Amino acid sequence: MERKVMILSAGVGSGHNSAAAALQRNLANRPDVSTVTTLDILTTTPEFYRTVYDDGYFEMVAKAPWLVGWGYDQADAPFQLGSRVPWWDQINTTETVTRIKEFSPDIVLATHFLPARIVANLQSAQELFTRMAIITTDYDVQGLWITNTFSRIFLAREESRQYLIASGFPEDRLTASGIPVRYEFGQQVDRPAVLAQFGLRDGVPILLISAGAAGGPYALRIVQQMQARTEPFQAVVVCGHNADLKRDMDTLVGDDTDRFHVLGFTTAMPDLMRVASIFVGKPGGLSSSEAMAAGLPMALINPIPGQEVRNSDYLLEQGAAVRNNYETTIGWKLGELLADPARLERMRAAAQATGRPGAASTVVNDMLGDRDGQLWISDKAQRSLREASHLDKPDRPASPKQRLRTLIDTSSGRSVALITDGQLKELSKVMWASGTGMTLERARLREITTLQLDPTLVTMLRNVLAHRPDLKVSIT
């Protein structure tokens, strides 16, 4: 059966769209896929909204990074901000909704939390019938990514999966796949050809400095400090689309072109990352995953509070990176690494062990091979999940009514709903139940006025039964 796949992203930075592109490329020429389309939803929104959402975020990163970290922490627990799309986002994404409905996808792959929440809201209102996968793009999972319904969540690492399982999510709906990156990062590279293309010498360590992401002043300081180092090295400085930075960098480097090679935007990052010795840059989810897939150690600079700090924690824990906390010592720290080839080799081995170059294939194969529907989470179960994940309430047992219960389709063995024990007892009074099993009947749900059930529970169960008259479930 050929299916239509829609990949939804949001161009806040480049990482979410890069993950989307990796997925689209993996889906190309699949015989079981009829059509693939990728939509950056911000391109369908009003210019003012797009500016606030994208530029406003990076303005906050530059001028009030503490506020970014505070906001991350406030939304860290699942469902901390609820599962509904805020009115501000709703009124600015009407064209997005229209585009999604018109395409009518069989499968949605969401690489940003906003389109995931939009799709979940459409599914809850029975305005869209599809299977949605959420593909997270940082090493830790943040609560904003979790919706009240999904088919599967793909996570960057096993600890994030274990965190959600410990919070109460069914483990059959969670996959530690890694973050999707272009397949080239995991392939062998023609090293002599790449070195010749960029005028690099074999046998001399190569620093790959992501200057555009680091920001102009910081990147210039890195190069200034490296100009004073005496260790053998050569550096490729990538300025991206920042023409002013490239001009300033060219001026700073001057005639020292044997050691410093200044580039603007380049599509050759997969090649450069596979021949480099150290990547110098920020620990974004995608850039970090690309470096790990290429087996490239990282020297981390200026992480954004929240997700980038969490990413750097993980990379340090894996032994694949060092982090620089002082702008004035980055040259010294890089010199220490260059002077210790054995340490660099250990870091390279750690990066290779951490990398997941096949993440895109895992996502695509799992979603195309899985024919089961969505998991639905009741409003009361969402509150229980939120409380279970709070770090400031350690080991506080849930009240009997708040304990989570999973409804499992007996024919497929897959979880279909997450409710509370109190809701299960209500349901048992009106549905046929026996031991640890129950039969959910759509006809009975039509009798809501006489059933006296929680209306939100009835609405959720109607979604569970949207395409079948009844469903036999076991309960755990």
Go through each PLM region and give its residues.
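C-terminal amphipathic helix plus adjacent low-complexity
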Residues: 342-392, 396
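Donor-nucleotide binding loops and adjacent catalytic segments primarily
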Residues: 191-193, 201-275, 309
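C-terminal "capping" alpha-helix adjacent to the active site of nucleotide-linked donor transferases
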Residues: 317-318, 326-343
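Active-site and donor-binding regions of nucleotide-sugar-utilizing enzymes
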Residues: 71-168, 173
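A nucleotide-sugar donor-handling region in carbohydrate enzymes
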Residues: 151-213
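Short hydrophobic beta-strand element within catalytic cores of glycosyltransferases
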Residues: 279-281, 297-306
